[in-house]
């Protein structure tokens, strides 16, 4: 993988990630394909929304279908018939989400299989092996996602163990002869000093890109913005920056304003299945009875298959009848909306008009523009 930075506007960056499997324009949003599928979508449909890279979940694909099945197909690209780049998470966040049925030690994580109760152990070395078999174009180190809230001391201990696990991940990745990219994950909760220690430790080990982890776990938006403003300028300019598990459309805009290059989130797909649709003028909750006879298009500014062919009334009807097509059409739209936001951000950075884009984005959403830190203002 090669990262090429084309231009900047303030702290926002316009670039591209070059892989053997294709080029990804940044800033980029990665749809989430948990079990080797973006729920309800064919790979061709996902590609048509504008997505150039997907995220797969190491933890879930390890449990089902397992490494043997993956190897029998070649890798995850062959298994799911997506020939573009794939980033896989390490399994750390999923293990964190298991709560009471897992035990974290220096060696790794002991937990019960969430389906059959079997005892399982996952460590940095195993995570690297699984991601190697998946053929991931971007591999993430195995880390502990620090819970929120955490005291300074809790966050410090968690971050330091993640650093040690990061070194073990790097060593195993290299021992496997993996020629793809490996990203480090910056931890440290809401504490700037701990974020610095984490980043410096990761820089000593050396990675192809750097993710900001442990955000979007319940902390106030102001804390997320503050940590991004603090951390992003310290990441080497020639390395991509990835904000994990984020987020709402405005979170993408705010991340880009602060120098983030990559995002992923289940929100556009999960919310689509719940009738929660993102549009240029704000959220449409399609289950609301006011849409029963609404013959207007979902989003007049959108060029997706759903908006070009169907009315809000029809989408309301499909949802009311629990028709599978409703979830699919909603997903097509939400994914396309997210990609249109990213395209708008990329174009604005290229033209040196990011401030204009941001102002118009929030005006249409009916929201105020969040302030940048003083040293971020052009």
From Swiss-Prot:
> Which molecular-function annotations from GO does this UniProt entry contain?
metal ion binding; tRNA-guanosine(34) queuine transglycosylase activity
Q: Which UniProt keywords apply?
A: Glycosyltransferase, Metal-binding, Queuosine biosynthesis, Transferase, tRNA processing, Zinc
Coiled-coil intervals: none
> Which residues are catalytic?
89 (proton acceptor), 264 (nucleophile)
Q: Which residues bind Zn(2+)?
A: 302, 304, 307, 333
GO terms (BP aspect): queuosine biosynthetic process; tRNA wobble guanine modification; tRNA-guanine transglycosylation
What EC designation does it have? 2.4.2.29
Tell whether Transferase is among the UniProt keywords: yes
Query: Its GO CC terms?
Result: cytosol
Q: What class of enzyme is it?
A: transferase
Q: In which pathway does it act?
A: tRNA modification; tRNA-queuosine biosynthesis
Q: Which reaction does it catalyse?
A: 7-aminomethyl-7-carbaguanine + guanosine(34) in tRNA = 7-aminomethyl-7-carbaguanosine(34) in tRNA + guanine
Pfam families linked to this entry: TGT
Which residues are substrate-binding? 89-93, 143, 187, 214
Known Gene3D superfamilies for this protein? Queuine tRNA-ribosyltransferase-like
Q: Which cysteines are joined by disulfide bonds?
A: none
- Entry cofactor note text? Binds 1 zinc ion per subunit.
Enumerate the residue ranges of region (RNA binding): 245-251, 269-273
Cofactors, names only: Zn(2+)
Q: What is this protein called?
A: Queuine tRNA-ribosyltransferase
**Which organism is this protein's natural source?**
Aeromonas salmonicida (strain A449)
């Amino acid at each position: 993988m090669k990262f090429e930075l084309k231009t900047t506007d303030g702290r926002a960056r316009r670039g591209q990630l070059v892989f053997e499997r294709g080029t990804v324009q940044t800033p980029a949003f990665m749809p989430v394909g948990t079990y080797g599928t973006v729920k309800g979508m064919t790979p061709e449909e996902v590609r048509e929304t504008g997505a150039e890279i997907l995220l797969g979940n190491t933890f879930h694909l390890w449990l089902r279908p397992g490494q043997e099945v993956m190897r029998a197909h070649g890798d995850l690209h062959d298994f799911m018939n997506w020939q573009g780049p794939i980033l896989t998470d390490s399994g750390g966040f999923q293990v964190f989400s298991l709560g009471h049925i897992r035990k974290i030690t220096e060696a790794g994580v002991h937990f019960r299989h969430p389906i059959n109760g079997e005892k399982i152990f996952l460590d940095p070395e195993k995570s690297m092996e699984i991601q190697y078999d998946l053929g991931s174009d971007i591999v993430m180190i195995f880390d502990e996602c620090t819970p929120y809230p955490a005291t300074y001391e809790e966050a410090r201990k968690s971050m330091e163990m993640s650093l040690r696990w990061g070194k073990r991940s790097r060593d195993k990745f290299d021992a496997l002869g993996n020629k793809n990219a490996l990203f480090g994950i910056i931890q440290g909760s809401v504490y700037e000093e701990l974020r610095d220690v984490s980043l410096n430790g990761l820089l000593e080990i050396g990675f192809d890109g750097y993710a900001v982890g442990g955000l979007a776990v319940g902390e106030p938006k102001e804390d997320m913005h503050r940590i991004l403003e603090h951390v992003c300028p310290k990441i080497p300019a020639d390395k991509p920056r990835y904000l994990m598990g984020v987020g709402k459309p405005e979170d993408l805009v705010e991340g880009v304003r602060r120098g983030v290059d990559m995002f992923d989130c289940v929100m556009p797909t999960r919310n689509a299945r719940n009738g929660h649709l993102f549009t240029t003028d704000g959220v449409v909750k399609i289950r609301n009875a006011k849409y029963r006879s609404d013959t207007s298009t979902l989003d007049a500014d959108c060029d997706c298959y759903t908006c070009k062919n169907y009315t809000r009334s029809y989408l309301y009807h499909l949802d009311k009848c629990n028709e599978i097509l409703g979830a699919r059409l909603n997903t097509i739209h939400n994914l396309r909306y997210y990609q249109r936001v990213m395209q708008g951000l990329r174009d604005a950075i290229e033209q040196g008009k990011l401030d204009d884009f941001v102002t118009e984005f929030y005006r249409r959403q009916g929201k105020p523009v969040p302030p940048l830190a003083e040293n971020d203002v052009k």
